[in-house]
Amino acid sequence: MLPALWVSKTGLAAQDTNLTTISNNLANVSTTGFKKDRAEFQDLLYQIKRQPGAQSTQDSELPTGLQVGTGVRIVGTQKNFTAGSLQTTDQPLDMAINGRGFFQIMQPDGTISYTRDGTFHLDSDGQLVTANGLALEPAIVVPADAQTFTVGTDGTVSITTAGNAATQVIGNLQTADFINPAGLQSIGNNLFLETASSGAPNVGTPGLNGFGTTLQNTLENSNVSTVEELVNMITTQRAYEMNSKVISTADQMLQFVTQNL
């Protein structure tokens, strides 16, 4: 088999994965707090037929040698944690982090997951939960007689009750940050898990020590740019077509050899 067939096959596979990444970004263009991915390419091993710098004669050496590439692969996907635009809403339970940090969400097994999606609701006990019913950590429980619900930029949660105009603090939000957010593991439902690559979470008060502030009646939009993704999609399509063309050309060359030799 011509080596070009294998090389082109790796190109098709890599561009297919790249297109899948782009399509996932576009599919989540309206997902609150979504962070786009970028596929990272890496060339495969080379066949060293003539070593660069090897002696060609007693008094001369090869300036470049002969190195034949064997293709390409997707080595990873890089999560881009640049902030999305902020959208004002009329829901007091909607929150966003303006700057670095993640909301902490308690999983059913007791582990902590992390999210930039601040779309919260109240469950039957008055506890702040995600759309899937997972509790915010630290737990915030809103009394049934609460008339107003306020979240400060420092994460202080306060309410007022009927017949009492005095503000009552019922809890404090704490956010988490990571040395390498791109190393977090995506598990769906807008949630991430800590990994060895992300490092241990640094938990703190919003607005202090580099943590972003919390904004009420606000949601963070996806950071996907449709224009940028469409340009990437066209580039990927062209690369896929060119690799397909190489396979067609190599096939024609093989047919010529079998028919004429």
Regions found by a protein language model. Give the residues of each.
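Amphipathic alpha-helical polymerization modules
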Residues: 1-261
